[in-house]
């Protein structure tokens, strides 16, 4: 009888885990199409990527505060100090803001599918920057993996029929910003020994990102948006979906591992590329596109399998053993 109860409990846990992974893939894929629709569609006509990103970060800041401080349904990890906040969290927040801003801007110029193909180059950017700051070690195996990914992205770009170099520049800028953010997060974990789950990170980071976006928004988009007729319901739902996506990452990582998120991310990328070809008339996939992207994804999958063996994942932050006895200077 006890064995049956244990089996039922195990199966129930397995179902919840698979459901959380499916939720993450659905929300992650859906949010990409939602953002593209809001920014580019004739129905909404909201071509303000900076304003949209600012709205997301402001919405996230308010919800994080309500969930952790007012309703107290979630707990923020302790150990944050003013010195760490200024030297680490603010730069991470700035890079996160830049990543979202440039990535959303790219949707105005290139297709969703091509954007996802370009994002496959991310491990290369992270590895190069990691070598520069001493977090990664150059090896023949890693060079081979990076070469495979780079070759695949180049081939998929060559196969793009309607390439827009302005969009490519924006997307590559977003990739570099995201790589810098991941490097800064790894430094925060390995060298400063700070333990932050994704929700805690969003709690500390969202206000910084919002402020970093607010300043350029005043000069670049505010005057254009003054005369725009806001679709409050659509933009609120878009912001809520973005926040739900961040919570789904927290849910998946808490039930599985950072490697699972990476594998789910690969599945999501393929899903986005294929679905975008069905949804958007502007997306025309070629055999060269798909071949190059397949090669890049093989490289990314190999990298994802290799990376956790060389150190703790930077997606799931954990306390460094080196600094586990170090006491914080004081609460923020």
Curated annotation (Swiss-Prot):
Name this polypeptide is given: Probable sugar phosphate/phosphate translocator At1g53660
Keywords on record: Membrane, Sugar transport, Transmembrane, Transmembrane helix, Transport
Species assigned in the record: Arabidopsis thaliana
Region feature (Disordered): 312-332
Domain of life: Eukaryota
InterPro entries xrefs: Sugar_P_trans_dom (IPR004853), TPT_transporter (IPR050186)
Biased composition (Polar residues): 312-322
Family: Belongs to the TPT transporter family. TPT (TC 2.A.7.9) subfamily.
Biased composition (Basic and acidic residues): 323-332
Subcellular location: Membrane
Membrane-crossing residue ranges in chain numbering: 19-39, 46-66, 82-102, 120-140, 143-163, 165-185, 199-219, 233-253, 259-281, 285-304
């Amino acid at each position: 009888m006890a064995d049956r109860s244990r089996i039922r409990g195990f199966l129930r846990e397995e179902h919840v885990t698979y459901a959380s992974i499916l939720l993450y893939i659905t929300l992650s894929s859906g949010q990409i199409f939602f953002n593209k629709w809001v920014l580019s569609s004739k129905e909404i006509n909201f071509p303000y990527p900076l304003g949209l990103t600012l709205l997301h970060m402001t919405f996230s800041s308010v919800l994080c505060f309500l969930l952790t401080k007012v309703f107290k349904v979630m707990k923020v990890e302790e150990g944050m100090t003013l010195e760490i906040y200024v030297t680490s969290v603010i730069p991470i927040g700035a890079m996160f803001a830049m990543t979202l801003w440039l990535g959303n801007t790219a949707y105005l110029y290139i297709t969703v599918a091509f954007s996802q193909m370009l994002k496959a180059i991310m491990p290369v950017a992270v590895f190069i920057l990691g070598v520069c700051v001493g977090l990664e070690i150059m090896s023949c195996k890693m060079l081979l993996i990076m070469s495979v990914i780079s070759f695949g992205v180049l081939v998929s770009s060559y196969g793009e029929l309607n390439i827009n170099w302005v969009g490519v520049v924006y997307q590559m800028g977003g990739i570099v910003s995201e790589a810098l953010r991941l490097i800064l997060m790894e430094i925060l974990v390995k060298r400063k020994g700070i333990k932050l789950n994704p929700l805690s990170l969003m709690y500390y980071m969202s206000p910084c990102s919002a402020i970093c976006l607010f300043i350029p928004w005043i000069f670049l988009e505010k005057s254009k948006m003054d005369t725009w007729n806001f679709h409050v319901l659509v933009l609120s739902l878009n912001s809520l979906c973005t926040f739900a996506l961040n919570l789904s990452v927290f849910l998946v990582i808490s039930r599985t591992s950072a490697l699972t998120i990476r594998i789910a991310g690969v599945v999501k990328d393929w899903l986005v590329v294929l679905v975008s070809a069905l949804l958007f008339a502007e997306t025309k996939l070629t055999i060269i596109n798909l071949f190059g992207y397949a090669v890049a994804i093989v490289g990314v999958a190999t990298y994802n399998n290799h990376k956790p063996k060389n150190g703790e994942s930077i997606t799931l932050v954990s306390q460094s053993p080196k600094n586990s006895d170090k006491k914080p200077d004081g609460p923020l």
